[in-house]
């Protein structure tokens, strides 16, 4: 559904403009409603169409609040989840708390990840790509069974 990397600018109010190519599907699938939250592993944000988020929220509600790790995941994802609505101009307001977490300033990158977007600061995105390409991790040993079967 969502793919590609697009450089965008945040305006003075912390809004970004969703690219035109995604607006119709977001209007159709989730009535322009989205949920933005933090990524658990990297300094970026995750932006979900509302219907996608509802299925994730269901999975999160099935986790046990008695298990410390599961409770931490719930706290981080749900505690930072912010509902955003795309306006008629395609703008989406990112809360100050989320912008601060992802170190967003003027230049941001919107990265399509099939069912969601990642939102990165420009410099953090460039560093992440560099790190991913130059990673010295033994590739074959770290591949999951799903990745071993993926042919590109």
Curated annotation (Swiss-Prot):
GO terms for molecular function: DNA-binding transcription factor activity; transcription cis-regulatory region binding. Negatively regulates its own expression and that of the subsequent genes in the proximal part of the division and cell wall (dcw) gene cluster. Acts by binding directly to DNA. May also regulate the expression of genes outside the dcw cluster. NCBIfam families: division/cell wall cluster transcriptional repressor MraZ. One of its GO terms (biological process) is negative regulation of DNA-templated transcription initiation. It comes from Hamiltonella defensa subsp. Acyrthosiphon pisum (strain 5AT). Keywords: Cytoplasm, DNA-binding, Repeat, Repressor, Transcription, Transcription regulation. Pfam families: MraZ. Belongs to the MraZ family. Residues 5-52, 81-124 form the SpoVT-AbrB domain. The keyword Translocase does not apply. This is Transcriptional regulator MraZ. InterPro entries: MraZ, MraZ_C, MraZ_dom, MraZ_N, MraZ_sf, SpoVT-AbrB_dom, SpoVT-AbrB_sf. GO terms for cellular component: cytoplasm; nucleoid. PANTHER family: TRANSCRIPTIONAL REGULATOR MRAZ (PTHR34701:SF1). It is found in: Cytoplasm, Nucleoid. Forms oligomers. PROSITE patterns: SPOVT_ABRB.
């Amino acid at each position: 559904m969502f793919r590609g990397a697009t450089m965008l600018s945040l305006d003075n109010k912390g809004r970004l403009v969703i690219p035109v190519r995604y607006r119709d599907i977001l209007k159709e699938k989730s009535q322009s409603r989205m949920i933005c939250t933090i990524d658990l592993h990297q300094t970026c944000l995750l932006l979900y169409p509302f219907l996608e988020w509802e299925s994730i929220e269901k999975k999160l509600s099935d986790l046990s609040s008695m298990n410390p790790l599961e409770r931490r995941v719930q706290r981080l994802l749900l505690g930072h989840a912010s509902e955003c609505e795309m306006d008629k101009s395609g703008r989406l307001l990112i809360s100050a708390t989320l912008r601060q977490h992802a170190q967003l300033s003027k230049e941001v990158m919107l990265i399509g990840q099939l069912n969601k977007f990642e939102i990165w600061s420009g410099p953090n995105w460039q560093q992440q790509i560099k790190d991913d390409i130059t990673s010295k991790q033994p590739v074959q040993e770290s591949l999951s069974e799903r990745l071993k079967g993926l042919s590109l």
